């Protein structure tokens, strides 16, 4: 049988009053990514031809934050219920395609669960995603006959027997475009809230003798939404623990999974060790035998084999060669490239610069817009003065150069191979090969010096 085309509808128009935020609810993040972006990504993974994003509150913010997303923006000017929301997208539905309804504030739904749901959809019927809850209070109960779903009964309308049912509605469903359009047109708002509910489609399908089947989510957290920051934090921690568990099973040693955050993707080699309170953002690649100390932040970096990153170092958009040592308290800013066996120590900042093989920048140093050759030693307190208040200039240092402590290199300037720069020197002109340069004033000794006396 030919597989039907698929489109997705994502409900994301709610304000999220209980977040106490100017940001629309679905833009609050899980693992550094807006909740609704997680759902959009899943819809793409399912192979959705069209993704209809229903938006309302904070529309300008939604469009700004999701400007690069390939979605059909569908405005719901008034929030009049879930069926009303889907109805806004109905004119775009093709009769013979499947439509899956998802929720922008339920970010942990998985591709596998949705594939099972789509596979289970009966011809001209509905497949409904349900879940069993130990405490189903407040949720619509699933009423079955001969295995099929015949109704969803809300808490306030349920009798004593129905209240004992543990299976509840999640709101996620699949049907074909023609059926959705037919049933949505018949949904009324004769209820206390005066809203149009998607759950009414179950009764309408049964009236038309169309089958409604339920597929149960195996993990309740897949369908949990976040209406406040407490629930958001719970989803965040669940998701992070899930990611940490996967990495542990792949051989990554995470010392404490409860104190690890992955806010992007991590590609890793063997025998990687990650200490507590490490944050990984964007796309990070770690080689074999990499050790990351406590409190480090890595964002969009490539780290070679046998690298040690000591505690509280921050690396962003950088490349580190094998057997390098970084930190503690080092900062690699965008464009930093360290070759193999380099050392970058405490309170060193490197930006848009290359450091050659075996070179050391160990203490209290700023290196910006620079090229440092191999086997150099850059002393404590060295500054590359790369900015004149309007433009940036380069410092180029050759191989086997020794730069003494408290040296300023005023760019643009070049230091040739083998040069030695004495401590306390200010370099304003190019330095030749194997030269020694010292610019500090001669030391004076004044005998019998009397310190000033404090006036009373």
Curated annotation (Swiss-Prot):
Keyword line: Acyltransferase, Cell shape, Cell wall biogenesis/degradation, Cytoplasm, Magnesium, Metal-binding, Multifunctional enzyme, Nucleotidyltransferase, Peptidoglycan synthesis, Repeat, Transferase
A GO molecular-function annotation: UDP-N-acetylglucosamine diphosphorylase activity
This protein's GO CC annotations: cytoplasm; membrane
PROSITE patterns for the chain: HEXAPEP_TRANSFERASES
Residues annotated for Mg(2+) binding in this entry: 105, 227
Active site: residue positions: 363 (proton acceptor)
Subcellular location: Cytoplasm
Matches recorded under InterPro entries: Bifunctional_GlmU, GlmU-like, GlmU_C_LbH, Hexapep, Hexapep_transf_CS, MobA-like_NTP_Trfase, Nucleotide-diphossugar_trans, Trimer_LpxA-like_sf
Quaternary structure and interacting proteins, as annotated: Homotrimer.
Name of the featured protein: Bifunctional protein GlmU
Organism of origin: Haemophilus influenzae (strain 86-028NP)
Lineage: Bacteria, Pseudomonadati, Pseudomonadota, Gammaproteobacteria, Pasteurellales
Gene: glmU
